[in-house]
């Protein structure tokens, strides 16, 4: 019986070879498995929840902000991430806010002291004068992208993929309050309070390989030169290394995301400097010498308006952006 089964398998492989078909590579299978945990209706439901009246626009220190933090904690726990210091969230004051932090070891058999931080701010304008500012693009899209990247990495770890760096996923609060959330995260690092739950050692600045910030990744209105809707902007390629741009291009081709790629803020050096170094959460880390990258689709006329709603986001494009960020991160780790 065993010989018969072997013969059938051998003939099948022989026929596949004669017909020019190839057995998929391990990398191709792995990439497909990671893709399969992210789909458009799932993204829609998550962005819809975060921009719903239940979250109230997610203003720092409000019930809606707390609801959002609890949602992040639930998602991190479901994915199998590990809390830091036994707690999923860390608090700061003036204003009162909380960062939500989850940890993913890079490998099981060996544990490295190299770390990549992937973060997105979850706070928004809230409800002002009775008017809800949903903040679907700004920045429910970035939060959902960050959580989706975490889910893809957890999927890969569960099937045996190992990485050279551990990943720390952070939902930041209070960007709109002078980036208090990212400043609180940096203070944790400075004070030695951000500890590796596997080794128990402090995650010090010299161990942080890179920070990746995802801020407003759902827009399609402010387009690049070609006018295509399906694009993505990566700011900070110099910080990520000389080959980061070509690596992003390679991943874009290899994994079929097919996005138009931009490496500055719509061709303006001044605006690139402002958005990369001044107005988003990677600023705090850049000021402290940590290599940092920002992924964005830029500001649109919907941002910070009552009509920044889930229905303005093209989920098929958001999905491809998430896939590309994940595959690029896999390569640079």
Regions found by a protein language model. Give the residues of each.
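N-terminal capping segment at the start of a domain
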Residues: 23-67, 79, 301-308
